[in-house]
Amino acid sequence: SGVENARDIGGYRTMDDHHVKKRVLLRSGKLDKATENDKKKLLEVYHLQEVIDLRTTAERSQAMDPVLPGVNAVWLKILNENVKSSSNNMIANMFQKPAASIPESTHPAYGIVQAIKAGAYSPAMYTPIVSSDYSRKQYHAFFMELLKSRDGALLWQCTGGKDRTGVAAVLTLAALGVDKETIIKDYLLTNDFSAQTIAYISSEAAKLTQDQAILRTVPKLVGVDREIIDRFYDAIEKQYGSMDGFLKSGIGLTKQDITQLRAMYLE
């Protein structure tokens, strides 16, 4: 129980020798199991003012966020729900609850194993975000929320707090001027923060299948994998020349937006 994979992205040093402010930019997985203590911490320690939910309609209905007093809730679906077959939906599909009519569907690793069998894991799973007008517009809207002034913290979340949320963190840290290796290290921290879940689902998956290729893929899908983020950067560099080019031409941030973000979130 509790909030999975929650962390503050503050404290990182930028290439021009500033630091990302602490306690203002938070990332996490779904909040439906947040304990009273979690909620208290978010409100009293972080002075949480806004939650941006990046999930699909189905994910939200299966795990509703708690209502937090005085906290503005914003919903930005990163994945286009109208594109049923696209690899875009792979990320969301593995979190959908399977039909109750399948007896073994209650097994904790069932959804992940089925998702892998259906081809949900690909090292290129984030690259559709780079080429999707829809997803880029949603991330633009995400940055517009970041640019609104507030006195407390802003938190963004999806289901696992690693893919859509991870991409949002990568783009945010890049816009703030943090170097690529540091950004990737932060992205990979999911494997530490979710270590228990990864170990549990991996051992449960071994009860469902003996297929070694599937079992090797489970931790990459429950956690994160370096190759996925490398491919994401490769796609950005191929299509936009650089991360800076992607933030400006792909996401639509102006020079002024980036200057303002840095003024707000660096010290």
Task: Please state what every model-predicted region is.
Residues 1-155, 167-267:
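Cys-dependent protein tyrosine phosphatase-like superfamily
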Residues 159-160, 164-165:
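Ser/Thr-glycine-rich phosphate-binding loops at phosphate-binding pockets of nucleotides
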